[in-house]
Amino acid sequence: MFPFARLLIAGACAMSLPVALAPTVAQAAPHATIAQTQALLDKAVAELKAEGPGKAFAAFNDANGAYKTRELYVFVFDAKGVYEASGANPRLVGTNAIDMTDAEGKPLVREMIAVAQRKGQGRVDYIWLNRADNRVEHKRSLVQQVGDHIVGVGYYAG
């Protein structure tokens, strides 16, 4: 092999090395799956039934607790749309979200309550801002009625 060719190949390899070794933190983490979402909802429903609202809501509101992972968190509304728990933002507790709409104007809290009350459990699809990457994306929340409470967990469905 000619000395120039060796130099050219060595240079190309050296230039590609930083790209190959670059940290992957800049890449978006994969979204949670429907199975992971359902598992967290099932866990939250079991907690609410076993421990009652006081202990369960405190656990759901704990940003470092077992009910918040990556993009998944538990939220709870009463039948009037008032937040009883929010793993995303506990400061929302006590605020009325009944008129909250998605990016396309869909009344998502009203629909979550209606689906849970009508069927006992179900899913609601909507368009929501993903704060991890500031993109508006399709989101799906799985909701379930437990007594007077609507418990939900949402994931970005791509």
Language model segments and positions:
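N-terminal membrane-sensor/transducer module of prokaryotic signaling receptors
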Residues: 2-4, 11-158
